[in-house]
């Protein structure tokens, strides 16, 4: 039961963070950096799959490692670094003109969001005990 609650908490946290980050804070930067590749038609289903995958990563790779708030932040940030790093470095390798500046900001965001989601998982797990 705790695993399911951690998954749902992570899933909701990812959505909230991404809506704030992508929809408000970083939107002008993303438009400037990614204009050649952006679509005008937002597709919900791929976003939902991404949020499910990120929540699964937190649930099964970060949550079992959490023994303190510090380890939550460390493992969450590390997962964010790996996921966003693979995405951005793959894009830099295969997409002509993929901006390094965007990649660095995106990877940093992956680490921050991963850490924040892990913090939520940590506090929820403490609440459930």
Regions found by a protein language model. Give the residues of each.
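Juxtamembrane/disordered regions of integral membrane proteins
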Residues: 1-129
């Amino acid at each position: 039961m705790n695993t399911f609650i951690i998954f749902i908490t992570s899933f909701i946290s990812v959505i909230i963070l991404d809506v704030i980050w992508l929809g408000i804070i970083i939107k002008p930067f993303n438009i400037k950096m990614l204009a050649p590749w952006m679509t005008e038609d937002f597709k919900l289903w791929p976003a939902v799959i991404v949020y499910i995958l990120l929540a699964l990563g937190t649930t099964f790779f970060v949550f079992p490692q959490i023994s303190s708030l510090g380890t939550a932040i460390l493992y969450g940030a590390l997962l964010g670094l790996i996921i966003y790093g693979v995405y951005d470095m793959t894009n830099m390798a295969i997409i002509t003109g993929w901006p390094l500046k965007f990649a660095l900001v995106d990877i940093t965001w992956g680490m921050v969001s991963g850490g924040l989601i892990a913090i939520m998982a940590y506090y929820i797990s403490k609440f459930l005990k």
